[in-house]
C-alpha cells in the first residue's frame, strides 16, 4: 500500500517517472467533476475490477496542486472511512498538448449521500441512518485531523457509499495540511451552503483564520441536509448565502419530530464561534453518535434501500456518482445517479496487485527476501489463476445480464419514443383542428360584420333618399303655395284697381260739371285723416305683407349674429345631453327660408341645415335619424388643405341666455385676441362616455354667410389665404375686423382635440395622404360651390342635391368609422398632445360632465416624412400637425380604446366646475409629454406654435449628476405615461365606463391643484404653457447619466460587483460607480464588441480585437491592473482565447443546472463550448454546427423540458433552430410580410414554459413562437418606432430603445408599461442590467458616448 512506501515531500515526487496506464487501466465513462479534474469510471484491464479514475492535465501552473493531492492521498487514504488511493499513472501526449495524470482510487458503486437522500421518500433519511453516517464521517475526519489535515469540503456529495453501505470521504482536492506551527488557514475554498462562518470571514478579512473545526460545521450542515433534503439557505443565490451565513444565527432543525439527542448534536456542531465549537474527539463521545442501536441492522437497511433503488431504475447503466468539485458552485445537489455496476469482491487482492505494480522496479536487497517473494508470488499466482477463472465466469454472466438489460432498455426507449410521437401527432392534429375552427369562426364573424355593415349602409341610403324626397316635396309644396299666394295677391290688386277705377268713374259721372281734383291723401297724414277706403286698402296690404319677402335689416341682423354656428360645426355635438333626442327647432319664418334657429342643448346644425332652405319637419326627422345612427364622424379633411381660403373658426361658443338664441348685432361681445384652432369647439365633448366616440369637425368649410347668397349681399367677404403656421413661427392668425360673422363669438375657450391618426386606413382615404408644406390650395366641393355662387338661384334643388350627396358620403364614412372603431394614435413623438378640457356650455342644472383625452403610444409609426426632425414643420402622417389655424391647444388627446395594446390616458373633468372662460390655455390636467419643440409666441403674446412644452419635476434636475449641471437643465427623457391608468383591453363599448373611472383616479388630484392657476390663466389670452408639475420625484423611474464622456463609441458593458466594465472601440475601462465616478483604463487599443462577467469562474468573456476573437480575461489579472498589489499575477498572461475562433458575431452564456454553456455565432456556423472546471479552468468544445444555410447574427440555447438542447439563432431572413442531438436545422419563424432582409433584435426564452416558448423580436415587431415554429399567441408585440436596441430585463419586461423614446413592455403580453421620450432624437444602445438598474449608452454626432442608467424599482413602477 501507499503507506508502506516512505513518505516523500512534494519535491521528491517525479511525475514524469510514473508509468503509462495503457494496457493496465481503461476509462469506461465520465461520472463527474472533481476540483481539479474529471472523474471517470475505469476498469482494470486484466481483472475487470472497477475503479474511480481522476484525470487531470499536468500544466506548469497546477503541478504543485497535483503533487500535493497525490501526497495527501498516498499518506492519508489508508483508513476505512476514506476512499483508498491505489496509484498514479502519466498518459503521455504529443508535444504541444499537456500530459494527463491518472489518479486511481477506490470506486464506490452506491453513489453519494445526496443521491441516497434524493432516492428516499420525502427526501429525508431515518434518524438512525443519519447517526450511522455522521459517526462514519466523524471517524474519517478524526483520522484526517490527527494528521493535521482539514478536508474543507464536507457535504453530501463528497460522502460516498459502497454497496455494502460503508461510508467513504472523497475529494481531497481542496484539503490542506495545517502548518505545524501556525495550525490555521486563511484561504477561501469550499461550497457556500456548507461553509463555516470563519471560512467565509477569511475572504472578507485577510487576518481571519480557521482550523479543522470548520469541518465540524460542515458536518452539522450535512446532517441537516440528510434530515431535511437540502442545506439551509439553499434556495438563495450562493453569493447571498455567503453574505447571510456569518450574519444569521446558527441554523437549527425545522421539524420538532427529531429526538433531543439529534437536535443537541446539531447545536454542538453549529456553534458560530469556532473557538467554542467542540473538537472531533468530543463529538465522537456525543450521545447521538455513541449510543447507536445495532449497527449491523442499520447497514442491512441501507444496503436493501440501495438495492431497491437500483431495481426501480431498471439498473440503468447511465451516469455514475458525480464527483463534484467546489468551484463556488451555485447549486448544492446536482449529481449523477449511483452506479449500477456491481462492485466485485477481491478488492484486497487488487490492492496487492497495485502494490506490486508500484514496487516492481525496486531493487531486491536481500536474496532471502527475493526467495520469499518468489515463493509468495507462486502461491499468489496459483490463487490468482483460480480467482481469474471464477472472475471470468462472473464477468461473462455480468456481460450477458448487461446485454439483456440494454436490449430491454432499448425496447422500452423505442416504445416510449413511439408513444411520444403518437401523442405529439395527436396534439398537433388537435391544435390544427382548433386553428381551423378558429379561422372558420373568424371568417364567419368577418362575413357577418360585412353583411351588417352593408345592411346599415343600405338603411342609411334609404333614409337619405326618403329625407331627400321629403325635402323636395316640401320645397315644391312651398313653391306652389307661394305661387298661389302671388296669384291671389295679383287678383286682389286687380280687384282693388278695378274698384278704384269704378269709383273714379262713378264720381266723374256724379259730378260731370264740377272739375274738382280728386282727393289724394298724404303718406305723412295721421291715420284718422285718411279716408275709410284708404284705411281698408292699407289694412289689407299690411296683412299681405306679413307673408311677403323679408326686410333687409331683418336679414342683416340675423346673419351678423355671432352665435350662429359655422358650417365647420356640422356633425358636432355642442350640448352635453345624449344626442339621441331629436333637435327642437324653432318655427321657420316662411319668408326667410335661409335661417334656422339653433338650440344649444340639441345638436348643432348639419351640413345641409346650416345654409340652405330647410323645412322644419324634414330637418327634424333627418337630424333624429342621424343622431340615432351615430355620434361620430371621422375627420377625413381635417388637415387636408393647409392653405384653404377660410377664416379662422371660433374656438368656443360664448355662454349666453338660452331664451334668446339669435343675438342682434349690438349684443356681440367685445373682441379679444383670437386663438384660433384647427377644429371646431363643438368637438370638445367628442370622447365623453355619453356618446362614446369622437365627433370630428368639418374643418375648412366656409362659415354660414359664405354659402348663403342673401348674406353675401349683406356682408363683404374677405377671403385671405391663411398660411400654415410652423411649430417655430411666431405669427398669430388673427382675424380681420371685416369678418364679424365668423369671429363674433370666439372666446379663448378650451380646445377640442384633433384626433391624430397613425395608420392610413382603407376606409378613410383622404386621411391617409400626408400634406406637403407648399401644396397649392384646393377647394373642397362644398366650398367651391358656396364661394363661386353669384347670386340667389331660381331654384334650390341643385344646392340641396349637392349637400345631400355630401351628407351621404359622410354618413358612409361615419358608419365605417363606427364599425371599425380605429385607434387614435400619436403619430409622431414630436406632436404635442396636451390634454384638452372642454369649456363649452354646461347643462342648465350645472351638472359636470366627464370626458377623456386619450393618447395612444403603442404604435408610433415609421412613416414620418424625411424632413421632420430637421425642419420647423412638424408633420404627421395623414394629418398635418400644425395647420394654418394654430394647433397649440388643438392637439388634445383623443381617441378610443386601442385594439393593439395601446396605452390610454384618461382624464375626467368631473372634479372641475368650469366658468364661462374655463381652460383658456387648453390644459386640464398635465401629463408628462414630449418636450421637443420650443414654445413660440405671437407679437401679442398669444401662443401659436403646434407643440406646447410641459416641464415636470422629474425633468428639473436637483443635482449636477442628473442630466447636466444646474437644476434648470431639462431632462433628456420625459416619462410619458402613467401605467396605473393605462388600458390595453380590446375595444368593447361596455368597457368605456371602466376607463372613465380609471381616468378619474389619475387627474382628480392634479386638477384640483391646477385649478387656481388655470382660473387666472383663463382671464387672459396669453397663457403659461410651462406649468410646474406637482408630482414628487419618486413617482417616476429615474434616468441618470455619468458625467464621463468617452471619446470613442461605447459598444458593450458588464457589471463587475458594483462597478461597470465598459468596452469601447479602442479599449476596456472600469467605471468606479462606488466612488467619484472615476474611470480606470485597463486595456488600450483593442476593440471590445461584447462582454460578460462570470464572477464565480473569475473570468470576463469577450469578443474583442480586430479579428473578433473570443477571449476570456481573468478577473484577478484585471483587478491587479488597477491595484498593482500582486507581482505574481502580473507575470502571468491575463487572458486566453476560446479555441481558434475568429470572426465571432455574437455569443450567449447559458447556465443550465451546474453547466455553463457558451453558444457562439460565427460567419456561417454555430459553436457550443462548455466550461470545464479545474484543472482545466477553461471553455472546452462541446458541439459544432458548420455550413449553415443562414448566417447567424444572434444566438441562444434552450433546454426543452430539461432534456433536449436546442440552439435558436436569428438571421437576416428570420429565426431558426438547431437540434443539438441530431444536428438538424429548421426554421421557426420567417416574417413573410417584410420584403428584403430583417434585423433580429432579441430572443427571449419565456419563463415557465419548460424552455419551449419564446418571444423573437425583429425590426419593430415581436412574435411569440415555440421551438417547433408554431405561433403560440395571437398577439404581435409592436414597437412604436424602429428600435436600435432591444433587451429582456429580469422584471419580466422587454425594453426597446428608439431614436425618439424608450419603451418598456410586458414580455408575457406585449402591452406597453411605459414610455420615456427624448428631448431630441438620439441613438441609444443597451449595455447590461441587474436587479432594478438598466444601463445604456448614447452616441452623439461628435462620437462622444455617455453611460446612462435607469432605476426601475418596484415602488416607483407602482407609483409611476
Swiss-Prot record:
Expressed ubiquitously. Highest levels observed in heart, brain and skeletal muscle. Expressed in normal colonic epithelia and colorectal cancer tissues. Pfam families: CNH (PF00780), Pkinase (PF00069). Autophosphorylated. Autophosphorylation is activated by RAP2A and induces association to the cytoskeletal fraction. SMART domains: CNH, S_TKc. Residues 317-335, 834-847, 987-996 have a biased composition (Acidic residues). One of its GO terms (molecular function) is protein serine/threonine kinase activity. Residues 290-1047 are annotated as: Mediates interaction with NEDD4. It is an enzyme of class 2 (transferase). It comes from the Eukaryota. Residues 720-755 have a biased composition (Low complexity). It is linked to Intellectual developmental disorder, autosomal recessive 54: A disorder characterized by significantly below average general intellectual functioning associated with impairments in adaptive behavior and manifested during the developmental period. MRT54 patients manifest intellectual disability, delayed speech and hyperactivity. PANTHER family: MISSHAPEN LIKE KINASE 1. Serine/threonine kinase that acts as an essential activator of the Wnt signaling pathway. Recruited to promoters of Wnt target genes and required to activate their expression. May act by phosphorylating TCF4/TCF7L2. Appears to act upstream of the JUN N-terminal pathway. May play a role in the response to environmental stress. Part of a signaling complex composed of NEDD4, RAP2A and TNIK which regulates neuronal dendrite extension and arborization during development. More generally, it may play a role in cytoskeletal rearrangements and regulate cell spreading. This is TRAF2 and NCK-interacting protein kinase. It comes from Homo sapiens (Human).
Amino acid at each position: 500500500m501507499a503507506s508502506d512506501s516512505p513518505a516523500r515531500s512534494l519535491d521528491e515526487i517525479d511525475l514524469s517517472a510514473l508509468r503509462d496506464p495503457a494496457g493496465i487501466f481503461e476509462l469506461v465513462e465520465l461520472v463527474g467533476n472533481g476540483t481539479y479534474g474529471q472523474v471517470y469510471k475505469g476498469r482494470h484491464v486484466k481483472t475487470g475490477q472497477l475503479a474511480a479514475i481522476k484525470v487531470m492535465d499536468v500544466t506548469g501552473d497546477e503541478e504543485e496542486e497535483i503533487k500535493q493531492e497525490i501526497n495527501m492521498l498516498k499518506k492519508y487514504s489508508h483508513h476505512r472511512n476514506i476512499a483508498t488511493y491505489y496509484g498514479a499513472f502519466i498518459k503521455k501526449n504529443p508535444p504541444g498538448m499537456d500530459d494527463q495524470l491518472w489518479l486511481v482510487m477506490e470506486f464506490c458503486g452506491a453513489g453519494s449521500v445526496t443521491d441516497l437522500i434524493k432516492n428516499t421518500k420525502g427526501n429525508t433519511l431515518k434518524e438512525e441512518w443519519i447517526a450511522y453516517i455522521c459517526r462514519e464521517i466523524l471517524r474519517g475526519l478524526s483520522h484526517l485531523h490527527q494528521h493535521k489535515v482539514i478536508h474543507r469540503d464536507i457535504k453530501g456529495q463528497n460522502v460516498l457509499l459502497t454497496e455494502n453501505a460503508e461510508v467513504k470521504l472523497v475529494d481531497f482536492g481542496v484539503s490542506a495540511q495545517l502548518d505545524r506551527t501556525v495550525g490555521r488557514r486563511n484561504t477561501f475554498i469550499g461550497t457556500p451552503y456548507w461553509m463555516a462562518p470563519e471560512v467565509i470571514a477569511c475572504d472578507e478579512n485577510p487576518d481571519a483564520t480557521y482550523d479543522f473545526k470548520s469541518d465540524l460545521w460542515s458536518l452539522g450542515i450535512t446532517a441537516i441536509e440528510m434530515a431535511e433534503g437540502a442545506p439551509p439557505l439553499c434556495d438563495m443565490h450562493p453569493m447571498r448565502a455567503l453574505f447571510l451565513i456569518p450574519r444569521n444565527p446558527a441554523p437549527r432543525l425545522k421539524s420538532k419530530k427529531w429526538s433531543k439527542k439529534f437536535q443537541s448534536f446539531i447545536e454542538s456542531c453549529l456553534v458560530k464561534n469556532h473557538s467554542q465549537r467542540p473538537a472531533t474527539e468530543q463529538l465522537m463521545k456525543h450521545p447521538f453518535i455513541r449510543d447507536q442501536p445495532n449497527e449491523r441492522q442499520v447497514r442491512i437497511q441501507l444496503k436493501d434501500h440501495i438495492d431497491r433503488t437500483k431495481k426501480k431504475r431498471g439498473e440503468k447503466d447511465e451516469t455514475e456518482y458525480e464527483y463534484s468539485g467546489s468551484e463556488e458552485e451555485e447549486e448544492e445537489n446536482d449529481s449523477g445517479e449511483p452506479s449500477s455496476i456491481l462492485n466485485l469482491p477481491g478488492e484486497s487482492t487488487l490492492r496487492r496487485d497495485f502494490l506490486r505494480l508500484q514496487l516492481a522496479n525496486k531493487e531486491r536487497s536481500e536474496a532471502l527476501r527475493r526467495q520469499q517473494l518468489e515463493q509468495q508470488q507462486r502461491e499468489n499466482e496459483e490463487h490468482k489463476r483460480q480467482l481469474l477463472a471464477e472472475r471470468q465466469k462472473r464477468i461473462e454472466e455480468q456481460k450477458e445480464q448487461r446485454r439483456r438489460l440494454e436490449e430491454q432498455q432499448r425496447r422500452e426507449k423505442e416504445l416510449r419514443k413511439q408513444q411520444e410521437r403518437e401523442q405529439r401527432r395527436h396534439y398537433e392534429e388537435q391544435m390544427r383542428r382548433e386553428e381551423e375552427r378558429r379561422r372558420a369562426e373568424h371568417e364567419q364573424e368577418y362575413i357577418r360584420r360585412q353583411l351588417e355593415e352593408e345592411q346599415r349602409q343600405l338603411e342609411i341610403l334609404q333614409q337619405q333618399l326618403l329625407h331627400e324626397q321629403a325635402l323636395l316635396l316640401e320645397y315644391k309644396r312651398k313653391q306652389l303655395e307661394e305661387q298661389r299666394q302671388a296669384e291671389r295677391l295679383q287678383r286682389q290688386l286687380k280687384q282693388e284697381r278695378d274698384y278704384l277705377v269704378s269709383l273714379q268713374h262713378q264720381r266723374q259721372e256724379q259730378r260731370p260739371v264740377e272739375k274738382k281734383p280728386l282727393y289724394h291723401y298724404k303718406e305723412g297724414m295721421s291715420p284718422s285723416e285718411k279716408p275709410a277706403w284708404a284705411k281698408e286698402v292699407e289694412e289689407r296690404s299690411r296683412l299681405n305683407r306679413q307673408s311677403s319677402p323679408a326686410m333687409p335689416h331683418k336679414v342683416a341682423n340675423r346673419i351678423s349674429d355671432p352665435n350662429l354656428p359655422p358650417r365647420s360645426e356640422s356633425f358636432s355635438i355642442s350640448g352635453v345631453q345624449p344626442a339621441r333626442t331629436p333637435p327642437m327647432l324653432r318655427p321657420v319664418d316662411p319668408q326667410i327660408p335661409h335661417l334656422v334657429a339653433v338650440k344649444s342643448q340639441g345638436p348643432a346644425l348639419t351640413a345641409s341645415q346650416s345654409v340652405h332652405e330647410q323645412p322644419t319637419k324634414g330637418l327634424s326627422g333627418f337630424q333624429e335619424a342621424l343622431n340615432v345612427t351615430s355620434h361620430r364622424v371621422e375627420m377625413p379633411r381635417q388637415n387636408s388643405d393647409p392653405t384653404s381660403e377660410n377664416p379662422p373658426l371660433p374656438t368656443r361658443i360664448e355662454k349666453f341666455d338660452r331664451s334668446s338664441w339669435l343675438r342682434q348685432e349690438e349684443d356681440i361681445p367685445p373682441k379679444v385676441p383670437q386663438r384660433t384652432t384647427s377644429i371646431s369647439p363643438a368637438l370638445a365633448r367628442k370622447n365623453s362616455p355619453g356618446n362614446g366616440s369622437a365627433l370630428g369637425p368639418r374643418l375648412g368649410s366656409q362659415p354660414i354667410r359664405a354659402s348663403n347668397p342673401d348674406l353675401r349681399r349683406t356682408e363683404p367677404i374677405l377671403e385671405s389665404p391663411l398660411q400654415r403656421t410652423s411649430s417655430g413661427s411666431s405669427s398669430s392668425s388673427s382675424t380681420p375686423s371685416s369678418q364679424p360673422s365668423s369671429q363674433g363669438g370666439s372666446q379663448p375657450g378650451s380646445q377640442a382635440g384633433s384626433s391624430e391618426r397613425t395608420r392610413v386606413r382603407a376606409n378613410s382615404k383622404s386621411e391617409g395622404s400626408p400634406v406637403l408644406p407648399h401644396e397649392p390650395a384646393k377647394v373642397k366641393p362644398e366650398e367651391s360651390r358656396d364661394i363661386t355662387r353669384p347670386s340667389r338661384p331660381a331654384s334650390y334643388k341643385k344646392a340641396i342635391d349637392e349637400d345631400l350627396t355630401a351628407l351621404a358620403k359622410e354618413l358612409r364614412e361615419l358608419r365605417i368609422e363606427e364599425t371599425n372603431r380605429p385607434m387614435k394614435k400619436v403619430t409622431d413623438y414630436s406632436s404635442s398632445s396636451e390634454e384638452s378640457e372642454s369649456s363649452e356650455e354646461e347643462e342648465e342644472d350645472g351638472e359636470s360632465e366627464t370626458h377623456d383625452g386619450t393618447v395612444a403610444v403603442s404604435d408610433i409609426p415609421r412613416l414620418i416624412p424625411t424632413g421632420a426632425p430637421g425642419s420647423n414643420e412638424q408633420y404627421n402622417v395623414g394629418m398635418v400637425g400644425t395647420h394654418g389655424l394654430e394647433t397649440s391647444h388643438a392637439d388634445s388627446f383623443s381617441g378610443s380604446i386601442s385594439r393593439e395594446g395601446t396605452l390610454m390616458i384618461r382624464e375626467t373633468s368631473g372634479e372641475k366646475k368650469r366658468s364661462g372662460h374655463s381652460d383658456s390655455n387648453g390644459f386640464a390636467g398635465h401629463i408628462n409629454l414630449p418636450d421637443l419643440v420650443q414654445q413660440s409666441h405671437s407679437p401679442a403674446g398669444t401662443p401659436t406654435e403646434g407643440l406646447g412644452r410641459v416641464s415636470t419635476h422629474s425633468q428639473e434636475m436637483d443635482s449636477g449628476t442628473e442630466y447636466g449641471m444646474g437644476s434648470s437643465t431639462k431632462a433628456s427623457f420625459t416619462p410619458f405615461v402613467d401605467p396605473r391608468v393605462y388600458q390595453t383591453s380590446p375595444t368593447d363599448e361596455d368597457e368605456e365606463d371602466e376607463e372613465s373611472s380609471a381616468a378619474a383616479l389619475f387627474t382628480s388630484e392634479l386638477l384640483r391643484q391646477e385649478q387656481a392657476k388655470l382660473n387666472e390663466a383663463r382671464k387672459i389670452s396669453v397663457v403659461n404653457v410651462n406649468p410646474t408639475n406637482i408630482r414628487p420625484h419618486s413617482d417616476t423611474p429615474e434616468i441618470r447619466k455619468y458625467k464621463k464622456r468617452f471619446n470613442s463609441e461605447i459598444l458593450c458593458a458588464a457589471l463587475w460587483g458594483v462597478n461597470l466594465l465598459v468596452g469601447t472601440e479602442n479599449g476596456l475601462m472600469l467605471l468606479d460607480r462606488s466612488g467619484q465616478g472615476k474611470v480606470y483604463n485597463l486595456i488600450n487599443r483593442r476593440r471590445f464588441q461584447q462582454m460578460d462577467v462570470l464572477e464565480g469562474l473569475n473570468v470576463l468573456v469577450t469578443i474583442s480585437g480586430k479579428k473578433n476573437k473570443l477571449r476570456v480575461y481573468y478577473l484577478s489579472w484585471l483587478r491587479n491592473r488597477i491595484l498593482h498589489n500582486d507581482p505574481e499575477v502580473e507575470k502571468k498572461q491575463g487572458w486566453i482565447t476560446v479555441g481558434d475562433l475568429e470572426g465571432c458575431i455574437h455569443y450567449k452564456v447559458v447556465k443550465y443546472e451546474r453547466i455553463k454553456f457558451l453558444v457562439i455565432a460565427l460567419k456561417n456556423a454555430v459553436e457550443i463550448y462548455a466550461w470545464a472546471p479545474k484543472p482545466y479552468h477553461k471553455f472546452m468544445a462541446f458541439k459544432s454546427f458548420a455550413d449553415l444555410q443562414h448566417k447567424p447574427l444572434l444566438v441562444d440555447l434552450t433546454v426543452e423540458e430539461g432534456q433536449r438542447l436546442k440552439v435558436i439563432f436569428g438571421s437576416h431572413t428570420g429565426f431558426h433552430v438547431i437540434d443539438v442531438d441530431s444536428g438538424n436545422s429548421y426554421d421557426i419563424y420567417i416574417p413573410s410580410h417584410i420584403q428584403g432582409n430583417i434585423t433580429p433584435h432579441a430572443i427571449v426564452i419565456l419563463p415557465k414554459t419548460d424552455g419551449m416558448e419564446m418571444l423573437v423580436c425583429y425590426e419593430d415587431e415581436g412574435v411569440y413562437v415555440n421551438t417547433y415554429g408554431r405561433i403560440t399567441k395571437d398577439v404581435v408585440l409592436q414597437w412604436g418606432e424602429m428600435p436600435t436596441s432591444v433587451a429582456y430585463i429580469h422584471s419580466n419586461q422587454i425594453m426597446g430603445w428608439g431614436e425618439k423614446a424608450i419603451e418598456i413592455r410586458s414580455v408575457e403580453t406585449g402591452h406597453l408599461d411605459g414610455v420615456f421620450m427624448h428631448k431630441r432624437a438620439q441613438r441609444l444602445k443597451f449595455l447590461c442590467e441587474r436587479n432594478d438598474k438598466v444601463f445604456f449608452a448614447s452616441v452623439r454626432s461628435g462620437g462622444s458616448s455617455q453611460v446612462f442608467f435607469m432605476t426601475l424599482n418596484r415602488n416607483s413602477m407602482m407609483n409611476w
